[in-house]
Swiss-Prot record:
It is found in: Membrane. It comes from Homo sapiens (Human). The keyword Transmembrane helix applies. Residues 247-275, 328-360 are annotated as: Disordered. The keyword Transmembrane applies. It is a single-pass membrane protein. Residues 342-360 have a biased composition (Polar residues). GO terms for cellular component: cytoplasm; membrane. This is Uncharacterized protein C3orf20.
């Protein structure tokens, strides 16, 4: 068999040989004790290897001078040096001179270069190498034993000075050794193997001596390996538990118990020795952990809460696929059991077969017991964990104030802790689909109720905890193959886990909480939610109240207007002209100017009915003279708020710029005045556009008002609603939008750019035939536009297109521009009713108008640019000897009417 072995085989062999080497070292120490050398409680790192050398990765095999080994620690080259020792700090007295010891030879550290030497074919060379190594080992061991004996004496003296038990020092070494990581111990064992294997003992003696002391080696045995982080060294300690038990009952002094014969002969005083703690970091960490444990224990004792621990494992035999999944965990060597290689360990060919047989038996005796598979674990603080057979966590419950209020998490059986469900202390939470779906949540529970969704996200069921019609009776959902969720109510939610004939049921909702906070907090949350709803309802109620007060105020103002109890102060003529001049300078369109609104408290002074009847004649006489036909635009819209004054003050001093509402503002009031009826009811034109009859039509058209205001008349028929229903709806909709928030629309719309009116052909107040039919030959569905008492437009097609809000607004603005340019129709102009064929010239003009309309914006905000283009076109047309008008055709889309200048 070749001496060159793989790295894995060497690693397994070193792991198996570690107990044997420790047994051999212990035997060597016993020999030293029998020879008169005191046995210390710990041995410093004999060969002074650094920590980096001990923990280096032996993954890359390199040739070695040891027969049958191939290993490398990866440590850097180390020069020849003497072993250095840690200086013990002095407290009060200086240290005594060290006892006589054999001269310290220079220790040749094994380097990587030395280990890479080739194997010698002759056995003589191997024997010489082994003998030299043994000599260096013996010389160094004697010196290190003496040094550690002196440290042990210091520890014993210090323990007596503070009144501690001398055995505590030994216990510290034993406890501190358990903190050493298993990999570090294995690497340290390998280091010891690489050095101790060079001794002069034969292979047969090595196996026999190791077998004789095999049972005494282990973590719980007196031999412990300790790493000192402060000095970066390893220590091999003997606890000597049997000797300590014998010396407890004796009344010998501390010097008799721990002073070796060698130091007694020298006469070193015990009180002059000082001790340095070999593991201060470990001791501080242990003390910190103990303090934390005691604090937690005191806290739980103060709460008087202590729950029994439940450590429940799977009883059934694990399936083969689960055993394969957990094979890595079962093969991992534990801290309290030595590694067991068993038959996997390969030994050199020179070893006898009987030794291998005995070694395998000892390894089987020290083998760890079969690892149990956890099922349900509960701890003192109330936390609970349920595990899958694979070892993954299935259910995790963490208590908050007590065990009755927990946070529950459900996980899938994969290593990545895939969350399936989450519930808070109140039982509110969500459950995810186990598979990838469009909607991740299958169940959602909140304080109001719950919902269940399908994979597409549609709500399948929805219920409320407090509703009488949507109360949940029971709900069971299989979260996965092992877990099932059962919901019987807001306070009854459980999770059942079943696997391998083992079942456990955990409560998710809050129950039996001794603190009594669950219901209060839930009630507070419900109250807070109710407060939010009440707050929203209060805001809505306040808004309704505000609107109601505004409506009532408008109603009261209407009554006051009818009674003539208040008057309104309008701006003077000078202020009005300045305001108009400023607006003309800024080139602001009249439609974009703010409209005058009459808020609560603003009213007008209306004369009594007798006074109005007596003065109506004079008013009507002045109306024709005050109706200008000038194309100059007069912008009289103001933004100044009106001031309310009492009736008495108005009578005492009435300024010429203060006037009451004219009777011509409202057609209804004007009609009642002309028919000598009671006008105290006032204007009622709040919802629909005012209806004008033949009684007041002529006087209403000639009443004094802003010349630029366009009066839009919609010709309707109350007996034929089908033909004029769309027109009525359009006029009423636009009228409501224009007069929104106004208490007296007919009075407050005096300064608007246009005003909407209706003319009913079938009204009983109309003449036979109606005045507009007799004068202009109008029909149902037409729209007439007047400005300054002159007819500007008439037809069914607006702005070249059909009947719509945008087209109506565009046609109104075009009529305003036509009036400013001086284009109007005669007062007695009659629209042709029969169908007519458009001439070629008329069709071209229609196409031109349509193309221009298409290029314009449909928005009312862009009408200004469109009107400017029309003005430029109209200015060119004024140079021609004829005037273009915009009348109506009944059946065709557009009918153009032209009149010669001489005829005009």
């Amino acid at each position: 068999m070749s001496y060159i072995k793989s790295n894995l085989e060497l690693y397994q062999q070193y792991t198996a040989m570690a107990p044997k080497l420790l047994a051999r070292i212990s035997k060597l120490l016993m020999i030293c004790q029998n020879a008169g050398i005191s046995v210390p409680k710990g041995i410093r790192n004999i060969f002074e290897f650094t920590w980096e050398e001990l923990i280096s990765d032996p993954s890359v095999p390199t040739p070695s001078d040891i027969l049958g080994l191939e290993v490398s620690f990866g440590a850097p080259l180390v020069v020849l040096m003497e072993p250095t020792f840690v200086q013990v700090p002095t407290l009060k007295k200086p240290l005594p001179p060290p006892p006589p010891a054999p001269p310290r030879p220079v220790l040749l550290a094994t380097t990587g270069a030395a280990k890479r030497s080739t194997l010698s074919p002759t056995m003589a060379r191997q024997v010489r190498t082994h003998q030299e190594t043994l000599n260096r080992f013996q010389q160094q061991s004697i010196h290190l034993l003496t040094e550690l004996l002196r440290l042990k004496m210091k520890a014993m003296v210090e323990s007596m000075s503070v009144g501690a038990n001398p055995l505590d020092i030994t216990r510290r070494f034993v406890e501190a050794s358990q903190l050493l990581h298993l990999n570090a111990k294995e690497m340290a064992f390998n280091c010891l193997i690489s050095t101790a294997g060079r001794s002069g003992y034969s292979s047969g003696q090595l196996w026999k001596e190791s077998l004789a002391n095999m049972s005494a080696i282990g973590v719980n045995s007196p031999y412990q390996l300790i790493y000192h982080s402060s000095t970066a060294c390893l220590s091999f300690s003997l606890s000597a538990g049997k000797e300590a038990k014998k010396k407890i009952g004796k009344s010998r002094t501390t010097e008799d118990v721990s002073m070796p014969p060698l130091h007694r002969g020298v006469g070193t005083p015990a009180n002059s020795l000082e001790f340095s703690d070999p593991c201060p970091e470990a001791r501080e960490k242990l003390q910190e952990l103990c303090r934390h444990i005691e604090a937690e224990r005191a806290t739980w004792k103060g709460r008087n809460i202590s729950y029994p621990m439940i450590l429940r494992n799977y009883k059934a035999k694990m399936p083969s696929h689960l055993m394969l999944a957990r094979k890595g965990d079962s093969q991992t060597p534990g801290l309290h059991y030595p590694p067991t290689a068993g038959a996997q360990t390969l030994s050199p060919t020179s070893h006898p077969s009987s030794a291998n047989h005995h070694f395998s038996q000892h390894c089987q005796e020290g083998k760890a017991p079969k690892k149990a598979f956890k099922f349900h674990y509960t701890f003192y603080d109330g936390s609970s964990f349920v595990y899958y057979p694979s070892g993954n966590v299935a259910v995790c419950q963490i208590p908050t104030c007590c065990r009755g209020r927990t946070i529950t998490c459900l996980f899938n059986d994969i290593p990545g802790f895939s969350l399936l469900a989450l519930f808070n202390t109140e039982g509110q939470g969500c459950v995810h689909y186990n598979l990838k779906t469009s909607c991740p949540y299958v169940l959602i529970l909140d304080e109001e109720g719950g919902t269940t969704n399908d994979q597409q996200g549609y709500v399948v069921h929805k219920w409320s905890w407090t509703s009488r019609t949507e109360t949940l009776l029971s709900l069971e959902y299989k979260v996965n193959e092992e877990m099932k969720l059962k919901v019987l109510g807001q306070d009854s939610i459980t999770v059942t886990f079943t696997s391998l004939n083992e079942t456990v049921t955990l409560t998710v909702s809050a129950n039996n909480c001794p603190h009594g906070m669950a219901y209060d907090k839930r009630l507070n949350r419900r109250i807070s939610n109710m407060d939010d709803k009440v707050y929203k309802m209060s805001r809505a109620l306040a808004e309704i109240k505000k609107r109601f007060q505004k409506t009532v105020t408008q109603f009261i103002n209407s009554i006051l207007l009818a009674a003539g109890l208040f008057t309104i102060e309008y701006p003077t003529k000078k202020e009005e002209e300045e305001f108009v001049r400023f607006k003309m300078r800024s080139r602001t369109h009249p439609e974009r100017l703010p409209k005058l609104s009459l808020y609560s408290g603003e009213s007008l002074l209306r004369s009594q009915s007798g006074h109005l009847e007596s003065s109506i004649a004079e008013t009507l006489k002045d109306e024709p003279e005050s109706a200008p036909v000038s194309p100059v635009r007069k912008t009289t819209k103001i933004h100044t708020k009106a001031k309310v004054t009492s009736r008495g003050k108005a009578r005492e001093g009435r300024s010429p710029t203060r006037w009451a509402a004219l009777p011509s503002d409202c057609p209804l009031v004007l009609r009642k005045l002309m028919l000598k009826e009671d006008t105290r009811a006032g204007c009622k034109c709040l919802v629909k556009a005012p209806l004008v009859s033949d009684v007041e039509l002529e006087r209403f058209l000639l009443a004094p008002r802003d010349p630029s205001q366009v009066l839009v008349f919609g010709i309707i028929s109350s007996q034929n609603y089908t033909s004029t229903g769309q027109l009525q709806w359009l006029l009423n909709t636009l009228y409501n939008h224009q007069q929104r928030g106004r208490g007296s629309p007919c009075i407050q719309c005096r300064y608007d750019s246009y005003r909407l009116l209706q003319y009913d052909l079938d009204s009983p107040l109309q003449e036979d035939p109606p005045l507009m039919v007799k004068k202009n030959s109008v029909v149902q569905g037409m729209i007439l536009m007047f400005a300054g008492g002159k007819l500007i437009f008439g037809g069914r097609v607006l702005n070249g297109y059909g009947l719509s809000k945008q087209n109506l607004l565009k046609q109104i603005f075009r009529s305003q521009q036509d009036y400013k340019m001086g284009y109007f129709l005669p007062d007695d102009y009659k629209f042709s009713v029969p169908n007519s064929v458009l001439s070629l010239e008329d069709s071209e003009s229609v196409k031109k108008a349509e193309s221009e309309d298409i290029q314009g914006s449909s928005s009312s905000l862009a009408l200004e640019d469109y009107v400017e283009k029309e003005l430029s076109l109209e200015a060119e047309k004024t140079r021609e000897p004829e005037v273009e008008l915009h009348p109506l055709s009944r059946d065709s889309k557009i009918t153009s009417w032209k009149k010669q200048a001489s005829k005009k």
